[in-house]
Amino acid sequence: RQMCIRDSTKSVDAANRLVHLLLFFQEAWAQATAQPPLHIHFYSSDLRTSERKQLLRAFERGEVDVLVCSDLIARGIDLPDVRHVISYDVPVDMAKYVHRVGRTARAGRVGDAWSLVEEQEVYHFKRMLSEAGQLEHIQRHKVHSGAFDPLLPHYKAALARLAQLYSQQR
């Protein structure tokens, strides 16, 4: 089970677009590869309390594979078995980073935190970690040109569906 966290300064609409993009991408990927589809959901303060509780229970039972939420809403979540936390936006301070990383490895379990860091953000991110004495705990995984070429047709299909969805909503 994975949790993808968007920076709370970003709009709910941006997080919704991310959820739709992930859904459309995984549908295209699943069709092409005969893989079972992932169950991806958006956990938001826009949901009623009962809906949020139901969604968290489904995540705990393994019925939801990916949960997308903001920093702010993630603060109230205590899930015991989150294998990966993916920070879609780079945390701006160490407290937020520690909070995000803390969503994994609850109760002594193993978990990984992934931060998607753009080239222009690397210096700030490394400096923040270094100042906190945490840089040695970080592994860098550089994505090489062409690594995602096999996924590109599915991504383009997902983007086209996303554009179509948002043009219909206007």
Language model segments and positions:
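Conserved small/polar residues in nucleotide/adenosyl-binding loops
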Residues: 1-8
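Arginine-glycine-biased low-complexity disordered regions
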Residues: 2, 13-39, 54-57, 61, ...
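Residue-level preference for the first positions of well-ordered beta-strands
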Residues: 6, 65-66, 112
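Conserved beta-strand segments of the P-loop GTPase G domain that flank and frequently precede/overlap
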Residues: 8-10, 43-44, 86-89, 115-117
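Conserved helicase motor
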Residues: 9-13, 40-53, 70-74
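Conserved two-lobed SF2 helicase motor
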Residues: 56-74
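SF2 helicase motor core recognition
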Residues: 68-85, 100-109
